[in-house]
Amino acid sequence: MSETLAQVRRTLRPVAIIVLVGALLVGFGPVVLDSYSVNVLTRSLLYAAVALTVDLLWGYMGILTFGQSAFFAIGAYTSGLIFTHIGFSPWLALAALVLGVLAAMAVAALVGWLAFWHGATNLYASVITLVLCIVCTQVIFSGGNFTGSSSGLTGFDSFDLSMQAWFWIAGGFLIVVTAGAWLLVHSDAGRILIAIRENEQRCEYLGLNTALLKTT
């Protein structure tokens, strides 16, 4: 029991440091930075959260994927389409958030099924995710006024928040994602991901459904 508690403390201590330091940086960032820097960093914080997922897949599972930007775009465009063509309200915003996540998950599940459930190599997954980005771009460009084409979706109503508030939201999101990623890679599930990267065939011999784990 004492060894288990000590292990939990060793795992949670870095998470507490990440949250504390991150909260301080995010909290005081808009106070010491000019509005232009806050605007740029808000976008950068969101992109950093997406980059963390690339690190998990490539760094810990050995799968080079180009699809994170596509999944990000699918979720964002799902919400944007709802706001543009249906309208905006707090309840619609919640529905758009849920539908955006579900749409991205559905496409990711389809890509995972194509890439991992047919005995294909990780290179095949890289090619599929690269093609997905190209397909998403062409769909948006070909959608005309419905998708905004090359100009994107603009002019729809949203929450009337200051750039400082958006900075805090983006920073808080990155802190949560970073802490979650740390807990994942230092858990039993994280060790399984590393084992799949090192020797996937042996993991299958041990009864692990590696295709399901990689898709998840």
Q: Language-model features: where?
A:
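Transmembrane alpha-helices and adjacent helix-loop boundaries
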Residues: 1-216
